[in-house]
């Protein structure tokens, strides 16, 4: 599973995929916008999809998820600071981590239609789920 994801991950453009995924999250699940009030205009799907702060943060998030691939045995420790930050400072509902993982899967499937096998989807979902669990650690 993780070898499959690692091999695939090198093809993923964090800027394009990450930005699109975070923008999609904010459009599809509008209540998540409350965590991004400092990001400027989130008034429409078009505004969100062209918002430079949204796109940059999406890239940052996807890059951080990719970094987790280097620490598969120790995700909770790897993401401990981010978990604390999202829990204590941002008060992000941890259910949103799963939503974002689902949106990433959707966007990756859209961009990599021919390579997006059920096996790859399974491996990606396992990784996103593990990252979400690690990020939710500070909530327990």
Swiss-Prot record:
Matching entries from InterPro entries are given as: Globin, Globin-like_sf, Globin/Proto, Hemoglobin_b, Hemoglobin_oxygen_transport
Q: Where does heme b bind?
A: 57, 86
Q: Which organism is it from?
A: Pelophylax lessonae
Name of the protein in its database record = Hemoglobin subunit beta
The family database entries (Pfam families) matched by this protein are listed as: Globin
Per UniProt, the keywords (alphabetical) are: Heme, Iron, Metal-binding, Oxygen transport, Transport
Query: In which tissues does this protein get expressed?
Result: Red blood cells.
Show the Gene3D superfamilies listed in the entry.
Answer: Globins
- Signal peptide (residue range): none
